Structures are given as C-alpha cells and as structure tokens.
C-alpha cells in the first residue's frame, strides 16, 4: 500500500497544496511564498527522504505567520494520513545533528498522541528575523503545529548555537532525520508497534 497523501487547504489567509510520499528519496519541489521557509522545508524533505511538493500562497504582505503555520498544519495532516494505521513502522527514533556551531537533538514517537517540547533556543532567538521574512519564534510554532496535526510526540532540544539561521536549520534537520527513521518500515515488526494494538 502506497504511503502517500495529497491535501489542499484553503482559508481566507492562505492556500496550501501539499503532496508527500513517505517512501521517497527526498525529492522536493517547494514554493511556500516565504524564501527562508522554502529552504527549511526543502531540508526537511531532503533529510527525511520524504518526497515533498508544496505550493502555497497567502497574505505574506501582512506577515509570514499565517502561511507558515498553515503549511505546517497541512504537512502534519498529510504525514498522519500517509502513515495510516502505522503498521510495521519503527515508531521511535532520535537524531542529533550539527551545523557548524549549532547542534540540536530531536526525539520522535509516532504515538498518535500529540505533544511537543522545544527547549534550548538562546534567549532572544524568537525575535530574530531570518532571511527577511521569518522570525525565530516561527520555528517552535512550526514544530508544535506539525506535532499536533500529525499526532506525534516530539522533543526538540537545541544544545548549542549562535547564528539564528544555523539554529533554525539544525532544528529542521534534526526533526527530518528523526522522522526518517521513525516512519521507516521495520522488517522485524509485523503488526502495529504498540502493546495496545493501536496507535
């Protein structure tokens, strides 16, 4: 069964068209209307090996927040849809990823219970403007939106970092690598990886 999803979400603030394939090679085609977010979502697809296509427009003349949030919501929904009943996946994974002076660790449980803990971002990071359109505060908001709508438990910890671009990027890459292993089929698991029999 193909682990794919396509979702279109349109509101008065944005229109998001997104498709993904969990069993891809990291091929991406990203146009979020927010240049730095293009970079982040491209990295997320590349390093998770999820084929990811996004076309989004929104009221970025007001602020990038609505469009960025809505893309994260749709990505989470698509991830949940593509995972189906989660039969045969590894479920748990973690990844620690460096980028020069920045280092972050992501731990993921594809549990069906949404939870997100983000820690370690340096004081003032949330106020940094990255790439002219993307504030540091949006990183946590993206992570929370993905976790809530995908139904996953995510712990993300920034261990070190100075450059706001590097800090944001390493958070996305750590999530990507953790997802890459958590969603991967485990050849030793035949059913649903839970003592409850459902996730």
Swiss-Prot record:
GO terms for molecular function: imidazoleglycerol-phosphate dehydratase activity. Pathway: Amino-acid biosynthesis; L-histidine biosynthesis; L-histidine from 5-phospho-alpha-D-ribose 1-diphosphate: step 6/9. Its EC number is 4.2.1.19. Keywords: Amino-acid biosynthesis, Cytoplasm, Histidine biosynthesis, Lyase. Belongs to the imidazoleglycerol-phosphate dehydratase family. PANTHER family: IMIDAZOLEGLYCEROL-PHOSPHATE DEHYDRATASE, IMIDAZOLEGLYCEROL-PHOSPHATE DEHYDRATASE HIS7. This is Imidazoleglycerol-phosphate dehydratase. It comes from Bifidobacterium adolescentis (strain ATCC 15703 / DSM 20083 / NCTC 11814 / E194a).
């Amino acid at each position: 069964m193909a682990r794919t999803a396509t979702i279109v979400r349109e509101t008065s603030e944005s229109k998001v068209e997104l498709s993904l394939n969990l069993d891809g090679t990291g091929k991406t085609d990203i146009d979020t209307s927010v240049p730095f977010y293009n970079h982040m979502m491209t990295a997320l697809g590349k390093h998770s090996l999820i084929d990811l296509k996004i076309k989004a427009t929104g009221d970025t003349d007001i602020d990038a927040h609505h469009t960025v949030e809505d893309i994260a919501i749709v990505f989470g929904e698509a991830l949940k849809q593509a995972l189906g009943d989660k039969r045969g996946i590894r479920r748990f994974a973690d990844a620690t990823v460096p980028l020069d002076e920045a280092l972050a660790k992501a731990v993921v449980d594809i549990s069906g219970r949404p939870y997100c803990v983000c820690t370690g971002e340096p004081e003032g990071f949330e106020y940094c403007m990255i790439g002219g359109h993307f504030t540091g505060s949006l990183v946590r908001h993206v992570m929370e939106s993905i976790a809530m709508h995908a139904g996953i438990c995510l712990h993300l910890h920034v261990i070190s970092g100075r450059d706001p671009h590097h800090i944001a990027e390493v958070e996305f890459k750590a999530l990507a690598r953790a997802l890459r292993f958590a969603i991967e089929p485990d050849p030793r698991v035949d059913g649903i990886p839970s003592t409850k029999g459902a996730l």
